[in-house]
C-alpha cells in the first residue's frame, strides 16, 4: 500500500518572538522540521508534502528535494492547511499521515506503529493520542459509553467537563487518503476560532458510519509541540536525555548525562568514556575505548579507538588510534592525526597531516603542513605559512627533531633524520641527515653590568 505524509509547517510561530521561521528553530543542532521529516521518511512513507507559508524559501532551503511543497497563504486552520496538498495527493491511493512540523521528538517507530494500527483496523482515520496531567491547550479525546471515539474537541470549544479529560489529541493522524480529501471539502469553520479544524474530518467520517481509531502512545514527550522558547528548551532536554540514554545502553559511559551534549548523528563505540561538560556535534564518529575529557568540544570529526581528548576543541578533524590530544589543544578543519600521535597543551593544528608517532607537545602552531612519522616538534615551534595573501606548505620528514622556538618559514621542506637547532628560523630546505642552525652566534660580554 502506498503511503504519503503531510507535514504542517506554515505557522508563523509568533510566541517564539523571533525573526526565524518557527519550524527552523533547532533542537539538537537540527531544525525541528528536519527531525520530523527524518522520522516521517524513516516510517516508510513514499512521498512527503510540506505545507509552508511565511518563510517558505527558508524551509525549502533546508529540506530541499526530500519533500514536495504546497503554499498556504492564509493560516485558516489545520484542515485548510492539509487541503493545500490537494494538487499533490488528491487522487492517490493508500494511507496519508499528517504530522506537525513543530514536534521534533516524534519517532519513526511511533509513526510506523500508528500506520500499522490504522491499516490493520481498515480505518478511514486514526488519531495518535496520549494521556497527560496538564492537558491545557490540547484538543480532548471524547469517548462514548463503549470507549470508542465520539469526537475531538478543541480547548476553546470545550465544556468544563470536556476540559477535565486528560486524554489529548497529538495533532498527528493517519487517514485513508481519498477519504481525507473527500471530507476536507465538507469541513466548516463554525467554532470559537473561526478556523477549519482537521479533527472535524473524523466527526464527518463517524457520522457516515466509517471507522475511526485511536492509538494511544505512552511516551508523552514524543508528541510535545514547541510554541515558545521554554518549550524549545524542554524539547532540547528531552532529545538529549533520549540520545544519552541510547548511547549508555549501547556500552558508552557518560559520567554526567545532564551536562553532556551529544548530537543525534553522532556514533560512539563501546567502552568509551565521556566526562562531564562535553559537547559532541555533527556527523562525528568515535571509536571504542576512547576517553573524551571534561569540557571538550568535538564537531564533525573522527576519533579512532583508544584515543584520548583532554579539554580540547576538535573541528572537522581526524584523530588516529591511541593518539592523545590536550589539554587545551585545538584541532582546526583539515587536521589529520595518525596513530600514537601526541598533541599537547596549547597546540593548534590546522590543515596539517601528522603521521604515526609524531609529537607536538607544547605551545606550537602547525598549519598547512605534513609532519613525518616519529618526528618531534619542540615547544614554541611555528609554521610560518601566510605571507598576507597566500598560504604555503611546510613538510618535515620522518624521525626528525625540531628544537624549541623554531620558525619554519614556508614553503620549506625538512628531510628525514634532520636536527633543527633551537631558536632557528628556517627559510631554506634542509636535506636528509642534516643539522640546521639558523640563528646569530651568542656573544657574551663579561663584566658588562658592573
UniProtKB/Swiss-Prot annotation:
Pathway: Nucleotide-sugar biosynthesis; UDP-N-acetyl-alpha-D-glucosamine biosynthesis; N-acetyl-alpha-D-glucosamine 1-phosphate from alpha-D-glucosamine 6-phosphate (route II): step 2/2; Nucleotide-sugar biosynthesis; UDP-N-acetyl-alpha-D-glucosamine biosynthesis; UDP-N-acetyl-alpha-D-glucosamine from N-acetyl-alpha-D-glucosamine 1-phosphate: step 1/1; Bacterial outer membrane biogenesis; LPS lipid A biosynthesis. One of its GO terms (biological process) is cell wall organization. InterPro entries: Bifunctional_GlmU, GlmU-like, GlmU_C_LbH, Hexapep, Hexapep_transf_CS, NTP_transferase_dom, Nucleotide-diphossugar_trans, Trimer_LpxA-like_sf. Residues 251-450 are annotated as: N-acetyltransferase. Mg(2+) binds at residues 102, 227. Its main location: cytoplasm. Residues 230-250 are annotated as: Linker. Keywords: Acyltransferase, Cell shape, Cell wall biogenesis/degradation, Cytoplasm, Magnesium, Metal-binding, Multifunctional enzyme, Nucleotidyltransferase, Peptidoglycan synthesis, Repeat, Transferase. Residues 1-229 are annotated as: Pyrophosphorylase. Its EC number is 2.7.7.23, 2.3.1.157. GO terms for molecular function: glucosamine-1-phosphate N-acetyltransferase activity; magnesium ion binding; UDP-N-acetylglucosamine diphosphorylase activity. It comes from the Bacteria. It catalyses: alpha-D-glucosamine 1-phosphate + acetyl-CoA = N-acetyl-alpha-D-glucosamine 1-phosphate + CoA + H(+); N-acetyl-alpha-D-glucosamine 1-phosphate + UTP + H(+) = UDP-N-acetyl-alpha-D-glucosamine + diphosphate. PROSITE patterns: HEXAPEP_TRANSFERASES. GO terms for cellular component: cytoplasm; membrane. The active site is at residue 362. It holds the Pfam family Hexapep. Binds 1 Mg(2+) ion per subunit. UDP-N-acetyl-alpha-D-glucosamine binds at residues 8-11, 22, 72, 77-78, 139, 154, 227, 332, 350, 365, 376. Homotrimer. This is Bifunctional protein GlmU. The lineage of its organism: Bacteria, Bacillati, Bacillota, Bacilli, Bacillales.
Amino acid at each position: 500500500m502506498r503511503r504519503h505524509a503531510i507535514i504542517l509547517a506554515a505557522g508563523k510561530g509568533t510566541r517564539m518572538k523571533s525573526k526565524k521561521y518557527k519550524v527552523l528553530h533547532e533542537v539538537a543542532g537540527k531544525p525541528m522540521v528536519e527531525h520530523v521529516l527524518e522520522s516521517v521518511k524513516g516510517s516508510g512513507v513514499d512521498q512527503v508534502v510540506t505545507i509552508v507559508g511565511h518563510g517558505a524559501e527558508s524551509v525549502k532551503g533546508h529540506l530541499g528535494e526530500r519533500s514536495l511543497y504546497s503554499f498556504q497563504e492564509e493560516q485558516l486552520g489545520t484542515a485548510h492547511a492539509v487541503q493545500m496538498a490537494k494538487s499533490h495527493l488528491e487522487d492517490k491511493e493508500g494511507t496519508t499521515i499528517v504530522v506537525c512540523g513543530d514536534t521534533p521528538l516524534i519517532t519513526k517507530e511511533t509513526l510506523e506503529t500508528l500506520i500499522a494500527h490504522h491499516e490493520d483496523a481498515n480505518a478511514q482515520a486514526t488519531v495518535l493520542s496520549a494521556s497527560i496531567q496538564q492537558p491545557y491547550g490540547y484538543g480532548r479525546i471524547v469517548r462514548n459509553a463503549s470507549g470508542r471515539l465520539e469526537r475531538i474537541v478543541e480547548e476553546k470549544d470545550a465544556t468544563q467537563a470536556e476540559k477535565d479529560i486528560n486524554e489529548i489529541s497529538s495533532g498527528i493522524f493517519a487517514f485513508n487518503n481519498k477519504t481525507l480529501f473527500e471530507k476536507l471539502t465538507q469541513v466548516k469553520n463554525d467554532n470559537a476560532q473561526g478556523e477549519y479544524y482537521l479533527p472535524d474530518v473524523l466527526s464527518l467520517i463517524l457520522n457516515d458510519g466509517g471507522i475511526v481509531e485511536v492509538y494511544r502512545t505512552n511516551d508523552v514527550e514524543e508528541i510535545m509541540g514547541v510554541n515558545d522558547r521554554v518549550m524549545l528548551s524542554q524539547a532540547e532536554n528531552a532529545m538529549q536525555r533520549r540520545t544519552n540514554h541510547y548511547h549508555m545502553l549501547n556500552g558508552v559511559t557518560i559520567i554526567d548525562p545532564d551536562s553532556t551534549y551529544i548530537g543525534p548523528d553522532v556514533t560512539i563505540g563501546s567502552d568509551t568514556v565521556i566526562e562531564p561538560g562535553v559537547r559532541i556535534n555533527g556527523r562525528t564518529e568515535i571509536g571504542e575505548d576512547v576517553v573524551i575529557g571534561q569540557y571538550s568540544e568535538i564537531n564533525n570529526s573522527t576519533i579512532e579507538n583508544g584515543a584520548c581528548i583532554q579539554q580540547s576543541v576538535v573541528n572537522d578533524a581526524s584523530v588516529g588510534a591511541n593518539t592523545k590530544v590536550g589539554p587545551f589543544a585545538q584541532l582546526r578543519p583539515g587536521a589529520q592525526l595518525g596513530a600514537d600521535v601526541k598533541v599537547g597543551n596549547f597546540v593548534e593544528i590546522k590543515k596539517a597531516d601528522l603521521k604515526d608517532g609524531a609529537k607536538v607537545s607544547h605551545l606550537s602552531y602547525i598549519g598547512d603542513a605534513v609532519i613525518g612519522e616519529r618526528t618531534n616538534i619542540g615547544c614554541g615551534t611555528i609554521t610560518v605559512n601566510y605571507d598576507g595573501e597566500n598560504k604555503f606548505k611546510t613538510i618535515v620528514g620522518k624521525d626528525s627533531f625540531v628544537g624549541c622556538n623554531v620558525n619554519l618559514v614556508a614553503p620549506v621542506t625538512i628531510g628525514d633524520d634532520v636536527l633543527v637547532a633551537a631558536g632557528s628560523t628556517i627559510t631554506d630546505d634542509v636535506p636528509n641527515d642534516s643539522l640546521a642552525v639558523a640563528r646569530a652566534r651568542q656573544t657574551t660580554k663579561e663584566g658588562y653590568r658592573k
